[in-house]
A protein has these predicted regions:
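ATP-dependent adenylation/nucleotidyltransferase module used to activate substrates
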Residues: 1-209
Length: 209
């Protein structure tokens, strides 16, 4: 039995309701996918609703290089299973600055750093997935905001702004968060200080200059 969202609705129905709202409200949609359980479920549910409504969406996958093979394999499966409703896939293998939890000498490191290619944990995707890869050598010329070593959090915001300008109109983006997994995630959802889209408590409205 599905988990009860409230006395009249379970979480699955509530999720489909929110996804349909997004498709009806926004001119373009992209999902931020990590290959983890939350964003994977979000992507699969969005694909089901997209087929029902005759819609398409894009995904942003930021590949941080030092990731489990099982995660990479799972992302490939997600892309294959949802390919019929995917507009664009942005598989980013870019030199971003990341926190390093295994060293007190080097608190940060840069993934996919070309000068350290001999030390890469793994190679970039090949075969049929190579066409999705965006790296330091082929990123769009419009990305004049991109800099080697930029912060992960900054990249996401710049990407969202670029994606919106590319498509025009209103853009919606999906992020898989389970509010009962951590206090910070719960506070992110229920915060009354953020600007919400049309008053929906599970949304955050962002405007770029």
């Amino acid at each position: 039995m599905a988990k009860i969202y409230n006395e009249n609705k379970n979480v699955l129905d509530a999720a489909f309701e929110r996804i349909e709202f997004a498709f009806n409200e926004f001119d373009s949609i992209f999902l931020s996918v990590s290959g983890g359980k939350d964003s994977s479920i979000m992507m699969q549910l969005t694909a089901r609703k997209a087929r029902e409504l005759g819609k398409k969406f894009s995904i942003l996958y930021i590949d941080l290089e030092a990731q489990y093979k099982a995660t990479i394999d799972h992302v490939k499966v997600l892309i294959d299973e949802c390919s019929d409703v995917l507009e664009d896939v942005y598989w980013c293998c870019l030199p971003l600055s990341l926190r390093n939890a295994v060293s007190v000498i080097q608190p940060k490191w840069i993934c996919w750093d070309k000068k350290d290619k001999a030390k890469w944990v793994r190679n970039m995707p090949t075969g049929k997935y190579k066409k999705y890869v965006i790296n330091e050598d082929n990123y769009p010329k419009e990305w004049d905001w991109f800099e080697r070593g930029m912060e992960f959090e900054d990249f996401i915001l710049y990407f969202a702004d670029w994606f919106n300008k590319k498509h025009g109109g209103l853009t919606g983006t999906g992020v898989g968060i389970r509010s009962d997994e951590s206090l910070n995630r719960f506070r992110t959802i229920i915060s009354d200080k953020k600007v919400r889209y049309k008053g929906k408590p599970w949304t955050t409205q962002v405007k770029f200059k």
